[in-house]
Amino acid sequence: MANTTITWLGHASFLFVTPEGKRIVLDPWYEGNPSFPESAKAELEHVDAILLTHGHMDHTGNAITLAQQTKAPVAGIVELIGWVQGQGVDATQCIGFNKGGCIELAGIKATLTTAHHSSSISSGSISLYLGDPCGFILEFSDGCVVYHTGDTCVHGDMALMGEIYQPNVTILPIGDFYTMGPRQAAHALKLIGSKFAIPEHYGTFPALHGNPEALQSELNKLQLNTAIVALQPGEAWTYPA
């Protein structure tokens, strides 16, 4: 069996391929996503599970369409998944759980974690609340443990996630403005203690000005040797490097 493979689909979208060949997409957004590589569209023709961190359209943009096309289960916090079902996704596909809860799907364990952000979707002039924003701990059969922090600022619970799950890969936003930037992200990595870090949620729009070089500079200030895996949209990385 191959090891876990992680492909960045631009902005905050990721495709995970498990050692068993299962395909899991997180926060799918490709229509209107300026950083989504069109060559990756074929990668989403078949998926085995869909994970959602929160309700903002740059994270749920194509979740409904993809769920209806692939019949894959969709997992996330209860209120968000209730909205997914309300959009026409079959109830048998919908897995709404809550922070601290762990489920098994597509051959992995997925645990919802705390994130500090907001979560809503606009309906005309009204914003619909879609539950708390979250991150995920993803545990794969080859020993790869991914902590996807979700959209967030740095927070103290990250140290607990590091202690409990000992993730070896952290995926975290660095763009600033709507999430933490490089300075806070470096402190997040200090709390978590993972060997590898994959930056995301940067460069899509001018406001998201954080970049991997700035993250490296901040890590140097903290004397951390976390290895930054700076993927290009559409690029895959296999654990362990």
Swiss-Prot record:
Gene3D superfamilies: Ribonuclease Z/Hydroxyacylglutathione hydrolase-like. The keyword Hydrolase applies. The keyword Metal-binding does not apply. Keywords: Hydrolase. GO terms for molecular function: hydrolase activity. It comes from the Bacteria. Belongs to the UPF0173 family. This is UPF0173 metal-dependent hydrolase Haur_4333. It comes from Herpetosiphon aurantiacus (strain ATCC 23779 / DSM 785 / 114-95). The lineage of its organism: Bacteria, Bacillati, Chloroflexota, Chloroflexia, Herpetosiphonales.
